[in-house]
């Protein structure tokens, strides 16, 4: 039965592409469409790095601080400079009481115990290999760089929050939309360069390319930079709560203007740079990106729209084969703890990232995660290139699904 659901979802997805995009899929499905490749080629490693570096001027961009608000303003100014008109979501945030059971999934059992069943990570996956403890650094003195430490000194306070998005309106189907997201906030007393400066910069670079004056799309694309991810996906959840019931409404009637087009898919980008493999037996990490590094594409098998989300994930995988220059992609079914989660029962949703979120990142495979070492200077061009390959993958997939092309 599940296979029938998946194939039905695939058929629905293909049907949604329109004749222009379907026609480009021949017997050799990995052959790129030259119109799409021309857009992908507008991505540039140095520009991607410059955007990440620009985000790090605001330290860890912790929500509820002046540095976070300044980062939102900076992101909005960049999006406007690309020609992508912006809007903001506004909501209130109050710190919830501490969770008395922060790890209900259990995690790994102690080495000396005999569990009744294999342990599972967040999202439902089974952790394997060498694991190290993870945590969120809250000690300012753990940051040895006085400049970065000073940037991050202001504590967070509860109250009003804002996040920014911009929109590329489609020409023939402005009433249908893909949402491309990343979270711009961080914590840990570093620069949040990877988590999630790398995803934020990726989304901004896609906004730059698609907002080119010579680029048009059939369908609408929204580029959203969520806030309050680190406190529980609050910014993305606020967007869903405020906007999901507005989908497809033409306002004013007869205008062909759709403030919230019908959602066709939501694609999140979170931590794009670091795939150095599992920790070594002594708990240290390899200094270089592993030769087998890949872009991870995850959907959640328990979501109400899991069949459609799986189809979307494989569309991203195919785009990676067509347009990514260096690193392949891998599809998994344990998407979790990321801003696509509030969307997953409303619209097909996937997450694009460096490692599997639950089984690998959650097992300590990225030692910079929420730590003072998440600095721009920590990463090298091999790391940044993994992020660029994720950008190539997403830009190629979005371009195909929205009928994007360069006007002649």
Regions found by a protein language model. Give the residues of each.
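Bacterial N-terminal signal peptides
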Residues: 8-17
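Second-shell loop/turn segments in exported
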Residues: 34-43, 56-69, 150-155, 185-197, ...
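Sec/Tat-exported extracytoplasmic proteins
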Residues: 40-47, 52, 56-63, 75-86, ...
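Structural recognition of the beta-strand scaffold that forms the well-ordered cores
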Residues: 48-56, 86-88, 163-167, 177-181, ...
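A non-catalytic alpha/beta surface segment that caps or lines the substrate-entry region
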Residues: 50, 54-167
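Alpha-helical metal-binding/catalytic segments enriched in His/Glu/Asp
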Residues: 166, 180-234, 394
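Metal-dependent peptidase/peptidase-like ectodomains
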Residues: 226-339, 345-349, 356
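His/Asp/Glu-rich mid-to-C-terminal helical/loop segments that flank catalytic regions of hydrolases
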Residues: 358-408
């Amino acid at each position: 039965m599940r296979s029938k659901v998946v194939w039905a979802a695939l058929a629905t997805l293909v049907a949604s592409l329109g004749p222009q995009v379907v026609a480009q899929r021949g017997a050799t499905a990995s052959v790129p469409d030259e119109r799409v490749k021309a857009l992908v080629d507008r991505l540039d490693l140095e520009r991607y790095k410059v955007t990440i570096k620009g985000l790090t001027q605001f330290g860890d961009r912790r929500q509820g601080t002046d540095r976070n608000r300044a980062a939102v303003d900076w992101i909005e100014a960049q999006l406007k400079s690309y020609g992508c008109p912006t809007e903001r979501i506004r909501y209130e945030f109050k710190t919830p009481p501490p969770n008395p059971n922060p790890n209900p999934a259990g995690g790994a059992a102690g080495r000396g115990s005999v569990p009744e069943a294999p342990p599972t990570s967040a999202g439902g996956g089974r952790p394997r290999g060498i694991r190290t403890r993870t945590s969120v650094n809250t000690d300012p003195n753990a940051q040895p760089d006085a400049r970065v430490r000073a940037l991050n000194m202001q504590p967070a306070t509860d109250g009003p929050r804002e996040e920014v998005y911009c929109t590329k309106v489609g020409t023939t189907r402005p009433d249908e939309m893909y949402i491309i997201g990343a979270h711009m906030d961080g914590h840990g007393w570093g620069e949040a360069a990877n988590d999630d400066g790398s995803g934020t910069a990726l989304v901004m670079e896609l906004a730059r390319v698609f907002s080119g004056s010579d680029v048009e799309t059939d369908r609408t694309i929204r580029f959203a930079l969520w806030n309050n991810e680190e406190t529980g996906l609050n910014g993305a959840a606020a967007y869903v709560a405020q906007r999901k019931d507005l989908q497809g409404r033409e306002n004013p009637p007869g205008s062909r203007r759709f403030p919230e087009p019908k959602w066709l898919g939501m694609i999140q980008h979170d931590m794009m740079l670091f795939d150095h493999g599992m920790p070594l037996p002594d708990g240290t990490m390899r200094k270089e990106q592993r030769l087998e590094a890949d872009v991870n594409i995850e959907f959640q098998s328990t979501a109400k729209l899991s069949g459609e989300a799986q189809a979307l994930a494989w569309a991203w995988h195919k785009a990676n084969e067509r347009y990514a220059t260096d690193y392949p992609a891998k599809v998994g079914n344990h998407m979790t703890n990321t801003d696509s989660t509030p969307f997953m029962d409303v619209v097909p949703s996937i997450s694009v990232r460096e490692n599997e979120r639950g089984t690998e990142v959650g097992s300590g495979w990225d030692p910079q995660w929420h730590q003072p070492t998440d600095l721009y200077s920590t990463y090298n061009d091999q790391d940044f290139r993994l992020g660029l390959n994720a950008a190539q993958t997403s830009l190629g997939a979005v371009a195909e699904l929205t009928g994007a092309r360069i006007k002649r």
